[in-house]
């Protein structure tokens, strides 16, 4: 595995010439999330409806993460087009992404409630590799992808957390731009995580064939 600064450098290289595209997708996801939250703002009783609808944003977010992953693999396709096409043709059409997102959200909420929020953070990092695994291994079910993510992140959650912490300066600076800076910081972080996934996959699964992975995840 590499240092956080090496991951950040590779993320910047992958996003070279694509920052604008990445920011546009971030904006699309942000606007979608805001629109979904409107019912709870208008009427207090609609809070539960907002929670349900927020699950529908997850496949779009997953499609975004995958577009950045493919960018690190050399894809030249425009990020906005890739994200929207993947969301429509894969993430929403294939219920695996929606089911996985729902399960992870429920586990995060339960863990957060009983551990004052700490458990929710742990669950987040435990299952953070799920969208990448569902993409790379179409034969995996949501449960199998979650199991494999747990195994991959065993002993690696702190390392990824530290990588995320190195972006704190950029996050704080984005406050000075009324949060607009996050449209660029978010893809920067997500691309670094995608590269982290690639390294972790190679390190943990290098001796595994796709057939073996499918079998052991059952």
Report each predicted region and the residues it spans.
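Cytosolic juxtamembrane C-terminal amphipathic helix followed by a basic/polar low-complexity tail immediately after
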Residues: 203-218
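Juxtamembrane "helix-exit" motif on the non-cytosolic side of transmembrane helices
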Residues: 38-43
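Short, surface-exposed linear patches
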Residues: 37, 155-157, 206-207
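Selective recognition of hydrophobic, aromatic-rich stretches within alpha-helical transmembrane segments
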Residues: 44-78, 105-141, 171-206
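Hydrophobic alpha-helical segments
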Residues: 24, 32, 75-77, 170, ...
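Short regulatory "switch" loops immediately downstream of catalytic or recognition motifs
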Residues: 33-37, 71
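Interfacial aromatic "cap" segments that immediately flank transmembrane helices
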Residues: 2-33, 81-111, 123-175, 218
């Amino acid at each position: 595995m590499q240092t956080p600064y090496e991951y950040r450098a590779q993320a910047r290289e992958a996003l070279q010439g694509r920052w604008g595209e990445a920011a546009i997708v971030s904006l699309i996801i942000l606007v979608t999330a805001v629109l979904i939250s409107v019912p709870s703002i208008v009427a207090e009783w609609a809070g539960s409806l907002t929670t349900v609808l927020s699950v529908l944003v997850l496949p779009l977010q997953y499609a975004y993460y995958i577009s950045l992953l493919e960018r690190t693999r050399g894809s030249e396709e425009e990020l906005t087009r890739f994200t929207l096409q993947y969301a429509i043709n894969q993430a929403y059409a294939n219920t695996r992404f929606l089911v996985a997102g729902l399960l992870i959200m429920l586990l995060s909420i339960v863990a957060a409630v009983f551990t004052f929020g700490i458990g929710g953070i742990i669950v987040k990092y435990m299952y953070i590799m799920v969208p990448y695994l569902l993409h790379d291994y179409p034969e995996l079910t949501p449960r199998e992808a979650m199991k494999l993510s747990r195994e991959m992140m065993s002993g690696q959650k702190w390392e990824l957390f530290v990588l995320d912490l190195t972006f704190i300066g950029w996050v704080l600076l984005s406050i000075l731009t009324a949060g607009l800076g996050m449209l660029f910081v978010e893809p920067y972080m997500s691309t670094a995580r995608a590269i982290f996934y690639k390294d972790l996959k190679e390190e943990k699964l290098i001796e595994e064939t796709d057939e073996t992975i499918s079998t052991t995840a059952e």
